[in-house]
């Protein structure tokens, strides 16, 4: 059975994320440990952490992934932002270890004029400064590629992995890949994309999927998510992606919108329908 869940809230306690996931009929999931729009430390007490670990195990929900702050910029040439980003990431990987969450997901960020190679060097060296606990892996998320943001090409993802001797793998976001020019709207396009990823990065580095349809055309670098099968990737592309052998054992987490009377439960059900139809 396909592993699929959604991004859930920790409001009222991190263990509430498990209950929310169960309401959605999800079997894995993603959380923020704090508001992603501000520099803030995770504030998760021992009792909360124990309750989260126990409830996840009891309900069979996992693997979970922590999504890092949107303010983190590993590629930045600015020393103060770099130090804040490293500090934030250290606290996220420590929180992951406490919660027994195996993954922390991060966007590489933007080089803001320093250039692609320098940006990749900056990201890799920032990641090298982390003391990543055993059992935790940092996932570099593929990006839509607007402005000077890095991580939109498989070559850039591989560039960071090759430069860094840390437990690093990749989270592919379907909407971001599509925006970056990887055409996932047809079975042929999906197959070609996975072949290119395997040749450049390696499928052994693919640990998680952000499964989202896109409201914008392929190659526009515009990141706006749509309901599964109802965006520009469409039903045929989503079906081909969900059922491709490359992701047979890779969990999917949704970041789809709540609109038009549809939210996470509808999208999770839709993923399972597309999986079963193949």
From Swiss-Prot:
| One Pfam match | AP_endonuc_2
The UniProt entry, under PROSITE patterns, shows:
AP_NUCLEASE_F2_3, AP_NUCLEASE_F2_4
Domain of life of the source = Archaea
Q: What class of enzyme is it?
A: hydrolase
UniProt-recorded Gene Ontology molecular function terms: deoxyribonuclease IV (phage-T4-induced) activity; DNA binding; DNA-(apurinic or apyrimidinic site) endonuclease activity; phosphoric diester hydrolase activity; zinc ion binding
Q: Which GO terms describe its biological process?
A: base-excision repair
The UniProt keyword set, sorted, is: DNA damage, DNA repair, Endonuclease, Hydrolase, Metal-binding, Nuclease, Zinc
Q: Which residues bind Zn(2+) 3?
A: 176, 223, 225
Gene3D superfamilies xrefs:
Divalent-metal-dependent TIM barrel enzymes
Q: Which reaction is recorded as catalysed by this protein?
A: Endonucleolytic cleavage to 5'-phosphooligonucleotide end-products
Q: Which residues bind Zn(2+) 1?
A: 67, 107, 141
| Residues given in the record as Zn(2+) 2 binding sites | 141, 173, 210, 255
Q: What does this protein do?
A: Endonuclease IV plays a role in DNA repair. It cleaves phosphodiester bonds at apurinic or apyrimidinic (AP) sites, generating a 3'-hydroxyl group and a 5'-terminal sugar phosphate.
Report the family membership: Belongs to the AP endonuclease 2 family.
Its name, as the record gives it, is: Probable endonuclease 4
Q: Which organism is it from?
A: Natronomonas pharaonis (strain ATCC 35678 / DSM 2160 / CIP 103997 / JCM 8858 / NBRC 14720 / NCIMB 2260 / Gabara)
Q: Which gene encodes it?
A: nfo
């Amino acid at each position: 059975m396909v592993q699929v869940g959604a991004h859930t809230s920790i409001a009222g306690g991190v263990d509430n994320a498990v209950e929310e996931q169960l309401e959605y009929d999800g079997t894995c999931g993603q959380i923020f440990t704090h508001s992603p729009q501000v520099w803030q430390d995770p504030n998760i007490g021992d009792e909360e952490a124990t309750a989260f670990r126990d409830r996840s195990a009891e309900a069979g929900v996992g693997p979970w992934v922590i999504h890092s702050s949107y303010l983190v910029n590993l590629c930045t040439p600015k020393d103060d932002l770099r130090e804040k980003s490293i500090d934030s990431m250290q606290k996220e990987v420590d929180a992951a270890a406490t919660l027994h969450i195996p993954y922390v997901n991060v966007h590489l960020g933007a080089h803001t004029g320093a250039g692609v190679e320098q940006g990749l060097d900056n990201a890799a060296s920032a990641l090298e400064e982390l003391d990543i606990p055993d059992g935790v892996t940092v996932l570099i998320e593929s990006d839509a590629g607007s402005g000077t943001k890095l991580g939109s090409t498989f070559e850039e993802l591989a560039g960071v992995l090759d430069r860094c001797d840390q437990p690093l793998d990749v989270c592919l976001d379907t909407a971001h890949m599509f925006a970056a020019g990887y055409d996932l709207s047809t079975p042929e396009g999906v197959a070609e994309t996975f072949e290119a990823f395997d040749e450049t990065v390696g499928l052994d580095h693919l640990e998680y999927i952000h499964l989202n349809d896109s409201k914008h055309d392929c190659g526009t670098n515009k990141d706006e998510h749509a309901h599964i099968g109802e965006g520009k990737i469409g039903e045929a592309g989503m079906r081909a992606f969900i059922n491709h052998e490359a992701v047979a054992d890779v969990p999917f987490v949704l970041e789809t919108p709540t609109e038009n009377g549809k939210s996470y439960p509808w999208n999770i059900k839709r993923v399972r329908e597309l999986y079963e139809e193949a």
